[in-house]
Amino acid sequence: LAEEAGGQAELMPFDVSVQAEVEAAVDNWQDAHKEDYIAVLVNNAGIRRDNLMIFMQDDDWNNVLNTNLNSFFFLTRRVLKNMLSKRWGRIVNMASLSGIKGLPGQTNYSAAKAALIGATKALAQEVAARKVTVNAVAPGFIATDMTKELPEEELKKMIPVGRFGKPEEVASAVGFLVSDEAAYITGEVISVNGGLYT
């Protein structure tokens, strides 16, 4: 898809929740691209392990926080040095309506995404002087594998536009935030949720 759009892409399989794998993957990429740096980072990893808090297992809590929050820390810290030294970078973190509103049965997911929003706002202030922007996109209910088991017809009644969003609509928001036109936007959370607010 990237090549069809005139860009280039590489697949780098690794587990974003494991710090050693993140370090190795980024080191390998940097070794193969000595003149380049990762100028745009979209922290898009996410999993859900929904359950009421009283029934939630330790693994359900830890796996969600490791994938949704710790991966942000591992990857962002690793690529940030080059962004700062080159004085240009774009970081977009995929948050969620759950991180803004909090949803029952998703205490783990809501906690991870809310923390990601806080980290976005804090880091944006740390790196703005070096022309690195840090923003978040908070999707609502988007038609993906992650939402296919949810009761869509019931949920659509709560969404003012009356439908689930499309992945392309989320991608458009991300595309704007990584563009030169968004250079004066940092520390923001853009909701893509069809008008579903708290």
Report each predicted region and the residues it spans.
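Active-site helix of classical SDR
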Residues: 76, 112, 120
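Short, small/polar-rich loop/turn modules that mediate ligand/substrate recognition or access, typified
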Residues: 128, 133, 185-187, 193
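Active-site loop immediately N-terminal to the catalytic Tyr-X3-Lys motif
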Residues: 54, 101-107, 129-130, 162, ...
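Residue(s) in the substrate-gating loop at a strand-loop-helix junction
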Residues: 96
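Substrate-binding pocket helix/loop in short-chain dehydrogenase/reductase
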Residues: 38, 52-53, 60-65, 147, ...
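Alpha-helical segment proximal to the catalytic Tyr-Lys
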Residues: 81, 125-129, 183
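The beta1-alpha1 cofactor-binding region of Rossmann-like NAD(H)/NADP(H)-dependent oxidoreductases
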Residues: 13-25, 58, 168-169
